[in-house]
From Swiss-Prot:
<dbReference type="InterPro" id="IPR017927">
    <property type="entry name" value="FAD-bd_FR_type"/>
</dbReference>
<dbReference type="GO" id="GO:0051537">
    <property type="term" value="F:2 iron, 2 sulfur cluster binding"/>
</dbReference>
<dbReference type="InterPro" id="IPR050415">
    <property type="entry name" value="MRET"/>
</dbReference>
<dbReference type="InterPro" id="IPR001041">
    <property type="entry name" value="2Fe-2S_ferredoxin-type"/>
</dbReference>
<dbReference type="Pfam" id="PF00175">
    <property type="entry name" value="NAD_binding_1"/>
</dbReference>
<dbReference type="InterPro" id="IPR008333">
    <property type="entry name" value="Cbr1-like_FAD-bd_dom"/>
</dbReference>
<feature type="binding site">
    <location>
        <position position="308"/>
    </location>
    <ligand>
        <name>[2Fe-2S] cluster</name>
    </ligand>
</feature>
<dbReference type="InterPro" id="IPR039261">
    <property type="entry name" value="FNR_nucleotide-bd"/>
</dbReference>
<comment type="similarity">
    <text>In the N-terminal section; belongs to the FAD-binding oxidoreductase type 6 family.</text>
</comment>
<dbReference type="GO" id="GO:0016491">
    <property type="term" value="F:oxidoreductase activity"/>
</dbReference>
<dbReference type="Pfam" id="PF00970">
    <property type="entry name" value="FAD_binding_6"/>
</dbReference>
<keyword id="KW-0560">Oxidoreductase</keyword>
<comment type="subunit">
    <text>The system is probably composed of an oxygenase subunit (Stc2) and two reductase subunits (Stc3 and Stc4).</text>
</comment>
<comment type="function">
    <text>Reductase involved in the catabolism of stachydrine (L-proline betaine), a source of carbon and nitrogen. Part of a Rieske-type oxygenase system that catalyzes the demethylation of stachydrine to produce N-methyl-L-proline (monomethylproline). This subunit is probably involved in the transfer of electrons from NAD(P)H to the catalytic subunit Stc2.</text>
</comment>
<feature type="binding site">
    <location>
        <position position="341"/>
    </location>
    <ligand>
        <name>[2Fe-2S] cluster</name>
    </ligand>
</feature>
<keyword id="KW-0285">Flavoprotein</keyword>
<keyword id="KW-0411">Iron-sulfur</keyword>
């Protein structure tokens, strides 16, 4: 067992070491990581990290929700599902084994009950969108107080419900976790007595009759979340109490945008990458991330839509036109940080990269 001589918290300056990998469902594996120094993990339940995966063609940056809770700080777990055509997750399933060390960036994200405390919760998820819900439910379970959570997860088949055993174990110990599984079809040659079909308003009323009184958290593919939003709004739910996690872009937030200056494709800009000693020219409509790649530099990035915050760098000179989707805080912007993936240089800009 790891001995902790002094309590300290992990930071992303230190790599993560894979200590176990656990199969969960078809093409789904939970990877458990520890800090080589023995540092503990401190994060909000529901947050994510971005992993730098050393793939043969060059590093890949992929963002994954932390499926463990901060109430269990000796390890950080990530539960991933390899989709058709996926490269990063498939690389993890095929190549990431016990003893390997990889770089991680984070934790980050505001999708957490920490920011929206309530007496009663309704967690609605589909597929791998279950992972932040598991983390938040585990944190409530570990708090020592009985929670009030209706936990709905939708999957194609019962065998594809991710982390089902973990959730059913917690639900078997206390009465405050009410699990509702919804599948499109049963597994061959296996009976299924739970809900079947696509999530809809009728199911919602049956599974959580007091949904109007609950704080709602939703995570899953965008079509699924859109259906949930429309169902709740159509039933008169107060949508200010609805929260969702998504890695697809929504209308952006403009930051650090001079009122009288707009990027022009005909105008040239100059970007100085101070740490690399490289200066390059580009159009004002190119992003700083694209300019860095064209110059042969690597700025870690994940979603490339201003959501995950992986490409955050400090701007030391000049102005940029940045339109993001929640991947950077107002405090970071005030401190001079920008997101390279959605920041366009105006005239001359210098960044620490």
């Amino acid at each position: 067992m790891t001995q902790f001589k002094q309590l300290s918290f992990w930071s992303d300056a230190e790599p993560l070491e894979c200590v176990t990998r656990t199969p969960e469902a078809p093409n789904v594996v939970t990877f458990s990581f520890q800090s080589p120094s023995g540092a503990l993990f401190n994060h909000d339940p529901g947050q994510f990290v971005t992993l730098e995966l050393p793939a043969p063609g060059g590093p890949l940056y992929r963002t994954y929700t932390i499926s463990s809770a901060p109430s269990r700080p000796t390890a950080l777990t990530i539960t991933v599902k390899a989709q058709d055509g996926s490269t990063g997750t498939r690389w993890m399933l095929d190549n990431l084994h016990k003893g390997m060390r990889i770089r991680a960036i984070g934790p980050a994200g505001k999708f957490s009950i920490v920011h929206h405390p309530a007496d009663k919760y309704l967690f609605i998820s589909a597929g791998s969108g279950i992972t932040p819900m598991v983390a938040m439910t585990t944190w409530l379970y570990d708090s020592g107080r009985e929670p009030d959570v209706v936990f709905i997860n939708c999957a194609r088949r019962p065998s594809e419900i991710i982390l089902r055993d973990r959730m059913e174990l917690m639900a078997s110990r206390i009465v405050g976790i009410d699990l509702k599984w919804v599948v499109e079809e049963p597994d061959p040659f296996r009976s299924w007595t739970g809900y079947r079909g696509m999530f809809n308003q009728i199911m919602l009323g049956l599974m959580a009759q007091d949904y109007l009184e609950r704080e709602v958290f939703c995570c899953g593919p965008e079509p699924f979340m859109r259906a949930v939003r429309e169902a709740l709004a159509g039933l008169g739910y107060d949508m200010s109490r609805y929260h969702q996690e998504s890695f697809t872009a929504e209308p952006g937030h403009a930051e650090d945008v001079p009122e009288d200056v707009i990027p022009d494709e005909q105008n040239h800009a100059e970007i100085a990458f101070a740490l690399s000693g490289v200066t390059t020219r580009c159009s004002e409509t190119d992003t700083i991330l694209a300019a860095a790649k064209a110059a042969g530099l690597v700025i870690p990035s994940g979603c490339s839509m201003g959501i995950c915050g992986t490409c955050k760098v400090r701007k030391t000179e000049g102005q940029v036109h940045m339109v993001h989707n929640g991947g950077i805080t107002d405090e970071d912007v005030e401190d001079g940080y920008i997101l390279a993936c959605c920041s366009k240089p105006l005239r001359r800009v210098s960044v620490e990269a």
